[in-house]
């Protein structure tokens, strides 16, 4: 059932408008972007994640994305990081039930870290080490690539069994699928490399396999890297072609990512102007028919409303702003946007903590 957030008429009419996906609808245009909270690996992590996400659903968020969960062991971020397995389905139901009880929707992010993994089994399209990881990956064989595609499909089916409304396939920020699409990291000479078309084959097949496993009434968000911001990254024609191909393959929504983790270009820090990358997201929106989500340095409902009203995007992704204030949407809807506890982009207790293995919190 679509639960509406109580709102004052004509305030943020575009931001708070429902979004029809055909088989289901989102109550507004706000997506809570994925962020690793550190709860994923804690003994009582599922119960604490349930409270965390349910609180944001109660605050009015239309659809939430979990922290990254790997589809297989090789793709996990660290030795003890989470993998989606059959024995965890009931535990994940604790999260989905809590969110649904508050009228929200939630999708599980499937994240294969590739060469960003911090364990001895890390794999990648080619044996090319990242400058931000002391560990070198092993290049996957053909059979392993095919198994990885199936692993994504199986993990998505388990997510559906656990009550998730869909999955987000993580294809940006320089992670595994992004590594396959870029010449920087994909030096293969077989059917998974050489040409741009071959390099984007893996994410396209992953989305198709997820759709095959989960059926037509399941949300598939594909997180696409709009700007890699690294040498040897994807060109704009490459990005546009990938967007079109994953749409055809079964994606319902395109969420956007800006910059690889190893990029030297700031993308979310305080000095980055608000909405600095919406020009690229508007360009992507012109290439596809499915909804496109704007991300990075969107901190206020006024800014979010304007970019949707101007046709730059169909939705907005808020991660840190919803860490700072879980009632961001409810306050905007009730005419109390001036009371929102606004994210200042300091990254000191969220991103810094995430990268040093501590619980994510907020300075504001």
Residue ranges with predicted function:
Residues 1-364:
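Flavin-dependent oxidoreductase catalytic cores
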